[in-house]
């Protein structure tokens, strides 16, 4: 059994969504945690739970961030967590239950394990995992949109994300 200690200082969770049919808006969640258990040498034994604090959303625009925290989007006054709980893990895919605004759907995402390295600063063993995917926000009750005069809508329904998580590990 491998002990995993999440290193939030060397981890990130970033997303992007199509805006006004012509560009992308990017942002991040600044507060999240990932708990992992299992044997790093046997991916089938790995189980993980990611917890994201949606009120930590950061798009570098305070007015937009406040709107994203409102009931039009994440409703952070009522829903203070987003969770992803794995069901299965392989070297290239992770399947699990994603819960946003109290709505749970099974999702499959791409995963990249980056091996094990020794941290020269403290001698600890570390590993990194990158998870990427696309989520249809409307499946989670995040339906806010506005029609454009030129056709189309203000926001895309698909949100692309990349989560990069680093862990100190020990046996």
From Swiss-Prot:
Pfam families from the UniProt entry: YceI (PF04264)
SMART domains: YceI
Any single GO CC term annotated in Swiss-Prot or TrEMBL for this entry: extracellular space
Signal peptide: none
Top-rank taxon, per record: Bacteria
Cystines in this chain: none
InterPro entries according to UniProt: Lipid/polyisoprenoid-bd_YceI, TTHA0802/YceI-like_sf
PANTHER family per record: PROTEIN YCEI
Protein family per UniProt: Belongs to the UPF0312 family.
Record's protein name: UPF0312 protein SAOUHSC_03022
The species this protein was found in: Staphylococcus aureus (strain NCTC 8325 / PS 47)
